[in-house]
Amino acid sequence: MAKQFKRKSNGVSESNRKRGRQELRKVTRTAARKQQQDENHEDDLDVNNDSQEDNSEKEIDEEDEEGERDDNRGKAYSALLTLLKSEHKEKPKNVTSGSSSQVEKANASDSEDDGIAGANVEEEEEGEIDNNVDENEIVSESDVDDDDEDATNRLSTDPFESHFNLPSDDYLAKEEKLVLKDNEKWRTVDKQTYSDLAISSLVQLPPGEPLNPPLLKSSKLSEYTIKKRVLDSYEQAYGTDLSDLESTLINPILNYRDVNFQYKSFKNKFYRRLYTLHALNHIFKTRDRILKNTAKLHAAKEDSEELELRDQGFTRPKVLIMLPTRDACYEVVEQLIKLSGTEQQENKKKFNDQFYVKATPPATKPEDFRDAFKGNNSDFFCIGLKFTRKSLKLYSSFYSSDIILASPIGLSMILENPDKKKRQYDFLSSIEVLIVDKCNQIEMQNWDHVNTVMKYLNKVPKEFHDADFSRIRMWSINDQAKLLRQTLVFCEYLTPSINNLISSKSYNLSGKVKFKPIINSENSMMNSIGLKIKQIFQRFDSQSPLQDPDSRYKYFINAILPSLLKTSSYEDGIMIFIPSYFDYLRVKNYLKTSTKFTFGSIDEYSSQSKLTKTRQEFASGKIKLLLYTERLHYFRRYEISGVKTLIMYGLPSNPLFYKELIRFIGKSVFKEECDLDLALVKILFSKWDAVNLEKIVGNERAPVLCNSMNELYEFR
């Protein structure tokens, strides 16, 4: 296989190429591996530390990438480990006695088993795979597409084939100009309302011609082109029939369209088995095609024929799944194992030790909070998965992995390591399916890390890692991979940042499908509060989303604050809820320097002693006014006592918070500290808050509040 690689001309010396080929040949003979390689190797991408909530707030210093020519041959695992071993020590408080020694043994044994070291680790792994393939394996693995004579029909019926192998160079060049260079508007071609499912869908296609024709919707997975091993595992676990919602969602996913799906409640986890099925189907189809084409090339070589078969990217990883916590990662990996049909899993015990903890938050907390923070809630991890015909290897190196699961912060620490020599991003160059799950949790951690990852996705690699250019698809070489990458986004509720992933950062030529829950006045959050309390929605003018923070601030200090004591029936118990931390700092500074209010302020960075003291002083009336942030409420879910008047500087992104905040007043009413008829809730909003407004008042009322002549609306 090594002889098929084309020579590189990017400043790589002839001696280095020869050395790479020699090591490639050596690595396939296990007995020839040197003990020194065993000692130097670290094949563990995960980091043994339980970072606290504030770890997600670390900012990565961005530096200019132009002109950068450092030697980045070091493994991505080593880059992450070296950085974190010095800064983040493993905290034993979340592991049972004896677990630490078990993890250490797992680490030691992993290092001993995988003695691959040096700058050519990705070449060694790939060489190992290619040289171990025989024709019998190729035939047995190709359990669906075994008829080569039917290749033309397959291209038109199998979305995998038509999406990645059918597009011509001319078509992609034309679409690249329309979508990326001219930035022409996408067309909305279909809107559907599924009343029985309480959702609606919107389909957008790119300018020009879309890539894939739509698939016929089916209630049976067997009618789609899914690998037999995956299909059998799925049907054995979940049955042969799909529900209406499952069939509605799986159709665009299998058709390689971008999907934005709101699952509404953490209890709805059916979508996860659908995207893991799709990820495995994609991985196994990719592997089958490579194996088949390798056999064809061997046969053509024996017959002295020249054959061009392009079926690969620059690097092996094809699926990236971003998740907020190790517990979420553990659940997804378990789902992948369940559907993969693999007979054995390497490093499974080590994975369980580092990712699984049997722990749940107190029963007094809300259910969604307990789900978000259960188990190992560390937000610092990355792990590679490599599949073979019968086995799965956990903790595989990046460049030999098929699927990478990572938290955005864990991945961004590799992509923008302060030490330039340890930076790696080449392994993201050939990602074909991006999945971002539990987006709302990730957003509460730090969405900037997601933006960092998106910046490096499908970027042409700095080095080519002995890639065989005769096998690389032309759209990868021409830097057009982003036009074919599928992005799947799953969230409980939509926010502008999450919506932006599909709307502005995705260019999939197969199109985009956005699912949206139907929220009317009956099932809106406002209707579920259970308190007949006065709720006043006050609209202010804002010319653009960019000017919205300034317009909101000016309106608040000029119109709301001066009349606050006049409009409120109580002089104390005034809470101001502020979703944005930057707005919070701005208002806090104004109250401190320009008013005489006796106020307190608590946020996600406040010490525990300050949190306790400030809450007590507010409940007793010593502090008249309290500033309270959304992220603090997310991470602590306090029940604040003493609230009589509630001012929402902005709408909460999570509609559940709206109900919980208003129930602070309900608590005061129950304690007979205030009268329900005299209590007040005032909400500040602009027309740019339509997305958040819909979740609270419903799809019918939101357009009226945003666009009518009146600026003030009262509900009870």
UniProtKB/Swiss-Prot annotation:
Q: What does this protein do?
A: DEAD-box RNA helicase-like protein required for pre-18S rRNA processing, specifically at sites A0, A1, and A2.
Assembly and binders = Component of the ribosomal small subunit (SSU) processome composed of at least 40 protein subunits and snoRNA U3.
Q: Where is this region: Disordered?
A: 1-161
Q: Residue ranges under compositional bias (Polar residues)?
A: 94-104
Q: In what ranges is there compositional bias, type Basic and acidic residues?
A: 15-26
Task: Report what the protein is called.
Answer: U3 small nucleolar RNA-associated protein 25
Q: Which Gene3D superfamilies match?
A: P-loop containing nucleotide triphosphate hydrolases
Q: What one GO molecular function would you report for this record?
A: rRNA binding
Q: Name one GO cellular component term.
A: small-subunit processome
Note the Pfam families from the entry.
Utp25_C, UTP25_NTPase-like
Q: Where in the cell is it found?
A: Nucleus, Nucleolus
Return the Acidic residues bias intervals: 40-69, 110-150
Fetch the InterPro entries from UniProt.
P-loop_NTPase, UTP25, UTP25_C, UTP25_NTPase-like
Q: Which family does it belong to?
A: Belongs to the UTP25 family.
| Major localization listed first in the record, in broad terms | nucleus
The Gene Ontology biological process annotation of the record reads: maturation of SSU-rRNA from tricistronic rRNA transcript (SSU-rRNA, 5.8S rRNA, LSU-rRNA)
Quote the gene name from the UniProt entry: UTP25
Sorted keywords for this record are: Nucleus, Ribonucleoprotein, Ribosome biogenesis, rRNA processing
